[in-house]
Amino acid sequence: MGIQSSWFYSSKHQSAKREGMVKEGKGGIVSELIYSNNQYSDNQYSDNQAVINRILLPLLRQSGNEARWLLWVSPHKKLSRQWLINSGLPLDKIIQLNRMSSITTVEAMERALASGNYSVVLGWLPTLSGKDTVRLQAAAQKGNALGFIMRPQDVSKETSRAESRSDLLKIHSIHYH
């Protein structure tokens, strides 16, 4: 089927939620991934992208085995079919929405997370208000989904600030070591 251009999928395909695959309120989280903008190639995601390759791809591969979809909302680049294949991601479970304003993107992410139809929702958003963050978190919990707010960072401009910051990658966990 390939990469879908819309997350409104035909009614002949029942959602995982309606099939009882998702239990509302049992989980779900929204987190933020900041990655180096310098390692982002013009046509596809770079093989040198540590955050993408080491953290996100294994999670996406695992989630691709579920009955639910993987949604990419307003990425800066069109997903490369070849990159998806090389990354081991299921082409028939990837949906991509493009060219949305940040306000519409937040709303689309919220609706997708809450629907229960998506195991993972990735959105490229500017810094969110506290209200938007709470909305996305509640939606993720309702739909038992993982939401990632993707933020590119230009390393050449941020190197001096990055050395003094420890919050470049936010990983939320209930377990502390």
Curated annotation (Swiss-Prot):
Keywords per UniProt: Cell cycle, Cell division, DNA damage, Septation, SOS response
SUPFAM superfamilies for this protein: P-loop containing nucleoside triphosphate hydrolases (SSF52540)
Species the sequence originates in: Photorhabdus laumondii subsp. laumondii (strain DSM 15139 / CIP 105565 / TT01)
Post-translational modification: Is rapidly cleaved and degraded by the Lon protease once DNA damage is repaired.
Site feature (Essential for degradation by Lon protease) residues: 177
Induction pattern: By DNA damage, as part of the SOS response.
Name the record gives this protein: Cell division inhibitor SulA
Family: Belongs to the SulA family.
InterPro entries: Cell_div_suppressor_SulA (IPR004596), P-loop_NTPase (IPR027417), SulA_CellDiv_inhibitor (IPR050356), SulA_enterobact (IPR047696)
